[in-house]
UniProtKB/Swiss-Prot annotation:
Protein name: Activating signal cointegrator 1 complex subunit 1
Tissue and organ expression note: Ubiquitous.
Clinical condition linked: Barrett esophagus: A condition characterized by a metaplastic change in which normal esophageal squamous epithelium is replaced by a columnar and intestinal-type epithelium. Patients with Barrett esophagus have an increased risk of esophageal adenocarcinoma. The main cause of Barrett esophagus is gastroesophageal reflux. The retrograde movement of acid and bile salts from the stomach into the esophagus causes prolonged injury to the esophageal epithelium and induces chronic esophagitis, which in turn is believed to trigger the pathologic changes.
Biological process according to GO: DNA alkylation repair; regulation of DNA-templated transcription
Species in which this protein is naturally found: Homo sapiens
Entry's Gene Ontology molecular function annotations: RNA binding
Boundaries of every KH domain copy: 86-148
Region entry Required for interaction with ASCC3, spans: 1-53
PANTHER family xrefs: ACTIVATING SIGNAL COINTEGRATOR 1 COMPLEX SUBUNIT 1
Entry function: Plays a role in DNA damage repair as component of the ASCC complex. Part of the ASC-1 complex that enhances NF-kappa-B, SRF and AP1 transactivation. In cells responding to gastrin-activated paracrine signals, it is involved in the induction of SERPINB2 expression by gastrin. May also play a role in the development of neuromuscular junction.
Top-level taxonomy: Eukaryota, Metazoa, Chordata, Craniata, Vertebrata
Coiled coil: none
A single Gene Ontology CC term: DNA repair complex
């Protein structure tokens, strides 16, 4: 075959290159059992990530996940273009109407059980407990465990954010300065495309976001609070020297590349003394939560900023990150934004009036609900770290 001129096959208007395949023939067909039996010799390899217990009946592995995730997955029996289509069926974000973890009529669970030669036991809907995987062969149990973990992780990533970690930047003086900024922008630039009062942040909600979380159970919320306390004890106090960190918001910048089509305008946040302590602190908190799996790793460093204008606020004043990308039925929403022309704002307000914030943010890393405006003064103390415990029940599966 000529490598530079391969045979082309046209399918549905697309050209595909047909590459040669060197087929090998064997005297004897391999028995599927041979693969499982051979893998048992590697039972003690250190690369195994899962704990598998050997029992008189074979092998056993367990995993625990929020009961909400047990009820997510439905396998649509249609098969379009050779790809299985996964759909969600739910009543609302936190109360899902479905059968078991792996599919309508148990199709997905049966498929995993058949292909891995295992048996999978799952708690009934609404009940907490462990998923138990048993099988005659260790390799099969590990394979089933891996596939279930992938399914759970995939659907967790698709859930709307329930909480976020942030430092509040809503001191009275800062709110007043922000309102003056808003008034001046509307007075000078309200005729510019897309600029109106609806896209400004609520001054009570000014904050510096560290990361977004999906917490689906009381246990995960408690784990988050405990991890915040560990961060405080292990490095936050050392970085801050046990004293409040004095920061300021000065200057504005936009997220995208075209100042004429802006979706997010933010105020830059930095230490008043010019040090890097705030950046170090938030990066280490982010790193700790990413390592635990509570925050999906998308960035290696936190961008220190406080959003002051966001076009998502036009339709939802409580918009925060990915929070609004899914409906209550779990369907993805394409949110079409109406960008605004930020050129005059950037030119007229290149130096946002310096807004000093002198609160003890080193001791008040907050676990918040999207849309909440609780301040450190009104939020309750959770293990020495400010949290929003009274609102927790509103964010849990099955709670109304």
């Amino acid at each position: 075959m000529e490598v530079l001129r391969p045979q082309l096959i046209r399918i549905d208007g697309r050209n595909y290159r047909k590459n040669p395949v060197q087929e090998q023939t064997y005297q004897h067909e391999e028995d599927e059992e041979d693969f499982y039996q051979g893998s048992m010799e590697c039972a003690d390899e250190p690369c195994d990530a899962y704990e598998v217990e050997q029992t008189p009946q074979g092998f056993r592995s367990t995993l625990r996940a929020p009961s909400l995730l047990y009820n997510l997955i439905h396998l649509n029996t249609s098969n379009d273009c050779g790809f299985q289509k996964i759909t969600l069926d739910c009543q609302n974000i936190y109360t899902w109407k479905s059968r078991h973890i792996v599919g309508k009529r148990g199709d997905t669970r049966k498929k995993i059980e058949m292909e891995t030669k295992t048996s999978i036991s799952i708690p009934k809907p609404g009940q907490d407990g462990e998923i138990v995987i048993t099988g005659q062969h260790r390799n099969g149990v590990i394979s089933a465990r891996t596939r279930i973990d992938v399914l759970l992780d995939t659907f967790r990533r698709k859930q709307p954010f329930t909480h976020f970690l942030a430092f509040f930047l809503n001191e009275v003086e800062v709110q007043e300065g922000f309102l003056r900024f808003q008034e001046e922008v509307l007075a000078k630039c309200s005729m510019d495309h897309g600029v109106d009062s609806s896209i400004f942040q609520n001054p009570k909600k000014l904050h510096l976001t560290i990361g977004m979380l999906v917490l689906l159970s009381e246990e995960e919320i408690q784990q988050t609070c405990e991890m915040l306390q560990q961060c405080k004890e292990e490095f936050i106090n050392d970085i801050s020297g046990g004293k409040p960190l004095e920061v300021e918001m000065a200057g504005i910048e936009y997220m995208n590349d075209d100042p004429g089509m802006v979706d997010v305008l933010y105020a830059k946040v930095h230490m008043k003394d010019g040090s890097n302590r705030l950046q170090e602190l938030v990066d280490r908190v982010l790193e700790r939560f990413q390592a635990s799996g509570l925050i999906v790793k998308e960035w290696n460093s936190v961008k220190l900023h406080a959003t002051v204008m966001n076009t998502l606020f036009r339709k939802d004043p409580n918009a925060e990150g990915r929070y609004n990308l899914y409906t209550a039925e779990g369907k993805y929403i394409f949110k079409e934004r109406e960008s605004f022309d930020g050129r005059n704002i950037l030119k007229s307000f290149a130096l946002l009036p310096r807004l000093e914030y002198n609160d003890a943010i080193s001791a008040h890393c907050n676990l918040c609900l999207p849309g909440s405006s609780d301040s450190p003064a009104s939020a309750s103390q959770v293990a020495g770290i400010t949290g929003v415990s009274d609102a927790y029940s509103q964010s849990l599966p099955g709670k109304s």
